[in-house]
Regions:
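Bacterial Sec-dependent N-terminal signal peptides
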Residues: 1-22
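Compositionally biased alpha-helical segments
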Residues: 19-141, 145-149, 155-160
Length: 160
């Protein structure tokens, strides 16, 4: 009976150890975690000595390495901006998708709505303007806070 219990305990322990991964962030910091899943631009994990589920934005993570197989999976590539022309590289996130990124400031702008302009074309132009301002300041991520005609506002995020 003791042997069965010992074998069962060892097999459970080995399976838990086999799930250990190493997350490498874009700033070079490495974290040892137990990877759970990726969903909605978030990576869910637990720390090795904890059962509490945590999450981090997939945009903050460079790669995920499975320790048991030495298998490396690229999660995201680092976004580098060289000026206003790179506004297409700026990503609009939801507030919940910014975990692991650092807030770097707030940008505001004014955009007049012309007569006959549709709401969708206005929103597209407003997003483009905010992305251009973020690219000019070197921030690859924004969260749009307000997209009203006289008060465009977004929070900028960069890598920690």
């Amino acid at each position: 009976m003791k042997n069965i219990f010992t074998i069962l305990t060892l097999s459970i322990t080995v399976s838990l150890v086999a799930q250990t991964h190493e997350i490498t962030k874009h700033n070079g910091i490495k974290m040892e975690v137990n990877f759970i899943k990726t969903a909605n631009n978030l990576v869910y994990y637990t720390l090795p000595q904890s059962a509490e589920e945590k999450s981090i934005s997939q945009f903050a993570i460079s790669q995920l390495q499975e320790k048991s197989k030495t298998e490396v999976k690229t999660i995201s590539k680092k976004i580098t901006l060289s000026g206003k022309a790179d506004y297409n590289k700026v990503i609009v996130l939801k507030p919940s998708q910014t975990e692991g990124l650092q807030e770097s400031g707030i940008i505001t702008s004014f955009l007049g709505k012309t007569k006959g302009e549709t709401n969708q074309s206005f929103l597209d132009e407003a997003e483009k303007r905010l992305k251009q301002n973020a690219a000019l300041k070197g921030s690859p991520f924004i969260v749009i806070v307000s997209n009203k005609p006289k008060k465009l506002k977004a929070v900028m995020y960069t890598y920690k």
